[in-house]
């Protein structure tokens, strides 16, 4: 039995997946297995993965699925004592997995999961521990008033291991038996907040979540806005409404905010990013009061 089962979901992007796999190989000494969910891969890219990385277990995914569903395809096959959830657009530059395994073994039995410090390519901190996410915090986040890189009660409390509250799905290590007992990722969510929801559930189950600020992983997030944003954002918002219990005040707040955004983009040239953002705002307005699932929302607005 391997010590760690590494689970990576990749949407037909070998250009970012392969460097991630190379970095795992270069910086990991604990025993591990690697399961890659090949989401909508072309036959050519699938063959390239199989040829270049024969040590990877390929988990095909050929239907429309969100992050939770895709991860769960692989999670149901894991054999390791721990699971490492890792984005395909991440790079290891230190023995991250070894360190997290050593950390969690030294923590109390109630410790269920631990995250590293997650940094952007330029070195800025994305998250290093996460506070509880409440409807109020989500509203502030919507206004760009939440900065998870700033120290607070739950973030960066020490130069090493400290207790936090919830998780960032880009990278975290979790005890497999606890993850299984939690039901893996909640498949009601299509694009977020499955990671936050998992952290909250672990706390509700009586477990604790931790972070180690002394180890970090690079998250190559960001880039240009694609046309899929007009389907991804409303699905993401709908998932958040489900997680927060469908509060009417929050739905009204988001509707008004997106109405103002749509109004702004109405006066800008309707092309490129402007048009994507205008449609995104309009689609969120339609989705926020909907009773459809996030997956149904995504299907409805997918260009």
Language model: regions and residue ranges:
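Active-site donor/metal-binding and catalytic loop motifs
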Residues: 19, 199, 205-229, 240
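Short, acidic, metal-binding catalytic loop of nucleotide-sugar glycosyltransferases
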Residues: 22-31
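Glycine-rich, basic loop-to-helix element that forms the pyrophosphate-binding segment
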Residues: 61-78
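Short aromatic/hydrophobic "clamp" motif used to bind/position activated sugar donors
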Residues: 83
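Acidic donor-binding/catalytic loop of UDP-sugar-dependent glycosyltransferases
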Residues: 90-103
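Acidic/His-rich active-site region of diverse nucleotide-sugar glycosyltransferases
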Residues: 101-182, 196
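A short, conserved alpha-helix in the catalytic core of glycosyltransferases
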Residues: 165-216
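Non-catalytic, C-terminal membrane-associated alpha-helical segments of glycosyltransferases
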Residues: 231-239, 245-303
